[in-house]
Amino acid sequence: MATSAMFILDLKGKTIISRNYRGDIDMTAIDKFIHLLMEKEEEGSAAPVLTYQDTNFVFIKHTNIYLVSACRSNVNVTMILSFLYKCVEVFSEYFKDVEEESVRDNFVVIYELLDEMMDFGFPQTTESRILQEYITQEGQKLISAPRPPMAVTNAVSWRSEGIKYRKNEVFLDVIESVNMLASANGTVLQSEIVGSVKMRVYLTGMPELRLGLNDKVLFEGSGRGKSKSVELEDVKFHQCVRLSRFDTDRTISFIPPDGAFELMSYRLTTVVKPLIWIETSIERHSHSRVSFIIKAKSQFKRRSTANNVEIIIPVPSDADSPKFKTSIGSVKYTPEQSAFVWTIKNFPGGKEYLLTAHLSLPSVMSEESEGRPPIKVKFEIPYFTTSGIQVRYLKIIEKSGYQALPWVRYITQNGEYEMRMK
């Protein structure tokens, strides 16, 4: 059984440690590992062997890392798996918790161990007692700072004792703001989603709440799911969230403050399909007038509706005598903004509306030298999230066992939402 190379990967498939033993495989082939694994999971296959061209990946998952042996054909998979598990056992003798952070902290020790444990792809010394005679360097262990007793810290300092309500209710809002900059030809140049989970809590006593999100949601560093998974970045929690519980099983468990607060915030860097797309056609007439044809198109599902849509179209600063015609909504010229604003109270999904505008333009040359600011769009879409995040459950646990009503609402709104004009 000859191993060509060894890899330790994080849960996104990124290489943390790599060791090439035989030089007979393409080391970049490991980049295909995570994609192959996702495909197998979608098919329902759980075999610990993946194949890409003439390279086999034999792997195990331990905590939040993958240990992968890359081999050519005709290998004893059982022996390789046994060796990988032995690696975990030996590593734990040096730095106790074998996980992504400790692997990064102890990469020097790991490289020394891999060199001693395997020679030209064949296992050699795997007994930790013997290895410790050769490799005496101590690993860096992950140490959790001891916590002071709850009585000293007043562990629930954010909530008072003795709170009472005649009607027990919880309101939870998932609010996502879409930041986007698109070119005039429809290419999304920059996009991100900035989200927050806001709560209003009116509950008696000292309740514990448990919040579960849908399975497609991943937290940064927590791992990887299928190709349609959503990974939240820059996640920040309110101090009431039990981080130890979250680190263990990703359950968001907390004793909430009374009243309104932000439970968590997050960011999602992804290519966002424009929810409302604006096409513009501009035509100048004999250096004295300019005409705009504006087409607004909603590109979200028909069952959703955007409310209070405002489309702000910039015009030359000296434009005047505006005339507008639109199939829906109202249009107002705002010279202080050097723009006209098209307002549509309700904009259903899958719809397309048209606006034409004619303005006098005393000095066309100045308009050309100014350049054109981007079109800005404001909107709010209830019962909808761009990321696909959903609340799967919100449990309320209180020792008196009272019934409480949880209300969940989703809102997607504009952030910096801009489109350049031709």
UniProtKB/Swiss-Prot annotation:
One Gene Ontology MF term: clathrin adaptor activity
Record PROSITE patterns: CLAT_ADAPTOR_M_1, CLAT_ADAPTOR_M_2, MHD
GO cellular component term, pick one: dendrite
SUPFAM superfamilies referenced in this protein's UniProt entry, alphabetically: Second domain of Mu2 adaptin subunit (ap50) of ap2 adaptor, SNARE-like
Gene3D superfamilies for this protein: 3.30.450.60, Mu homology domain, subdomain B (2.60.40.1170)
Primary localization: Golgi
One Pfam family linked to the record: Clat_adaptor_s
Positions of disulphide bridges: none
One of the GO BP terms on file: vesicle-mediated transport
Cited InterPro entries: Adaptor_comp_med_subunit, AP2_Mu_C_sf, AP_mu_sigma_su, Clathrin_mu, Clathrin_mu_CS, Longin-like_dom_sf, MHD
Localization: Golgi apparatus; Cytoplasmic vesicle, Clathrin-coated vesicle membrane; Cell projection, Dendrite
Keywords per UniProt: Cell projection, Cytoplasmic vesicle, Golgi apparatus, Membrane, Protein transport, Transport
Tissue: Expressed in the cholinergic motor neuron DA9.
Membrane topology term: Peripheral membrane protein
Function: Component of the adaptor complexes which link clathrin to receptors in coated vesicles. Clathrin-associated protein complexes are believed to interact with the cytoplasmic tails of membrane proteins, leading to their selection and concentration. Required for many aspects of development and behavior, including negative regulation of vulval differentiation. Required for the dendritic localization of potassium channel kvs-4 in the cholinergic motor neuron DA9.
Subunit structure: Adaptor protein complex 1 (AP-1) is a heterotetramer composed of two large adaptins (gamma- and beta'-type subunits), a medium adaptin (mu-type subunit AP47) and a small adaptin (sigma-type subunit AP19). Interacts (via N-terminus) with kvs-4.
Family, similarity comment: Belongs to the adaptor complexes medium subunit family.
Protein name: AP-1 complex subunit mu-1-I
Gene of this entry: unc-101
